[in-house]
């Protein structure tokens, strides 16, 4: 038995639950990060957006918090809804892409101009 077959045999019992573990961890992470920004509007984010000259910072900050909770919920609930769940999961994933692109651009833009990007977990967070 070669190593590939051996690893396949070890992983086989977990094939059914692996996507659920990923859904639960990623979805819960976004729900908690969004919930941590309540009550709306999140004052720290509003101040950061104001300092960057963003129009309507209180509205945008509130939309980010609600979007994080909604996206995390969609990622988790998408696994429960059968065929419709694929659409729900993709919509939640699309919201995550928009939110995280904005987060990297607005809050973590220094990550892209430093060697620290490749020497810590930041590159993996960006890849997510």
Regions found by a protein language model. Name each.
Residues 1-39, 58-73, 77-128:
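Extended, low-polarity transmembrane helix blocks
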Residues 39-56:
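Membrane-interface interhelical connector segments
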């Amino acid at each position: 038995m070669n190593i590939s077959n051996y690893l396949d045999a070890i992983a086989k019992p977990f094939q059914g639950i692996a996507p659920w573990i990923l859904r639960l961890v990623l979805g819960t992470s976004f729900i908690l990060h969004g919930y941590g920004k309540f009550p709306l509007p999140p004052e720290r984010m509003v101040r950061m957006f104001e300092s960057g000259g963003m129009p309507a910072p209180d509205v945008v900050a509130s939309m980010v918090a609600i979007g994080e909770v909604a996206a995390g919920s969609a990622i988790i609930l998408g696994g429960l809804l059968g065929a419709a769940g694929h659409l729900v999961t993709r919509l939640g994933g699309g919201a995550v892409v928009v939110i995280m692109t904005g987060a990297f651009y607005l809050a973590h833009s220094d990550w892209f101009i430093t060697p620290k990007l490749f020497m810590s977990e930041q590159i993996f967070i960006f890849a997510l």
